[in-house]
Amino acid sequence: MDLRLVLVASPILLALGWAGFNIGRAAVGQLQLMIKRSRA
């Protein structure tokens, strides 16, 4: 692994990971709302 490649890739991977985490959390919240509505 080239150090420059790591320096370029790490912020991109962090950004993708953070976006994926936020999207996943939002999706879980929506699913929980749907489950609550279907039970009520």
From Swiss-Prot:
> What keywords is this UniProt entry annotated with?
Membrane, Photosynthesis, Photosystem II, Thylakoid, Transmembrane, Transmembrane helix
**Transmembrane intervals:** 5-23
Q: What is the lineage of its organism?
A: Bacteria, Bacillati, Cyanobacteriota, Cyanophyceae, Synechococcales
Q: Which family does it belong to?
A: Belongs to the PsbY family.
Q: Name one Pfam family in it.
A: PsbY
**InterPro entries for this protein:** PSII_PsbY (IPR009388)
Q: How does it assemble?
A: PSII is composed of 1 copy each of membrane proteins PsbA, PsbB, PsbC, PsbD, PsbE, PsbF, PsbH, PsbI, PsbJ, PsbK, PsbL, PsbM, PsbT, PsbX, PsbY, PsbZ, Psb30/Ycf12, peripheral proteins PsbO, CyanoQ (PsbQ), PsbU, PsbV and a large number of cofactors. It forms dimeric complexes.
Listed name of the protein: Photosystem II reaction center protein Y
Q: Where in the cell is it found?
A: Cellular thylakoid membrane
Q: Name one GO biological process term.
A: photosynthesis
The UniProt entry lists membrane topology as: Single-pass membrane protein
Q: Name one GO molecular function term.
A: manganese ion binding
Q: What does this protein do?
A: Loosely associated component of the core of photosystem II (PSII), it is not always seen in crystals. PSII is a light-driven water plastoquinone oxidoreductase, using light energy to abstract electrons from H(2)O, generating a proton gradient subsequently used for ATP formation.
The cellular component terms of Gene Ontology attached to this UniProt record, alphabetical and capped at eight, are: photosystem II; plasma membrane-derived thylakoid membrane
